[in-house]
């Protein structure tokens, strides 16, 4: 069962539809780092990252990773660590995963740019939102919808961004 982004603000899985937000500049086939677009394509869901100091009870079949204070996601296209989970390092550009604003209390890593091609986009996740504000390229859901989505995904679920 796949998750499909239909229209620009509806995520659908099975018979469930959830309002969501996407990149501020819409959907684009050839994503470029920093373009504020959500990448078009079909992507495997990888790991579920979560803040265990805030979230303890949830159902999910994906591999889970506890977010720690020193975790980041490298968004420096010139680094060999580009589009990878890293231990925060002052010499690298990164997206911090341990945040105060609750947007990353839960996030699902998708396999966009898994070959780590420089400038092809990094840190594309399904994560939380409070107000459906446009993202830098991710897909964002309200927490209650995210938790329902987690119950529905399987190890074979893909995300289709059309």
Model-found features: residue ranges?
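Cell wall/extracellular polymer interaction/catalysis modules
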Residues: 1-136, 143-162
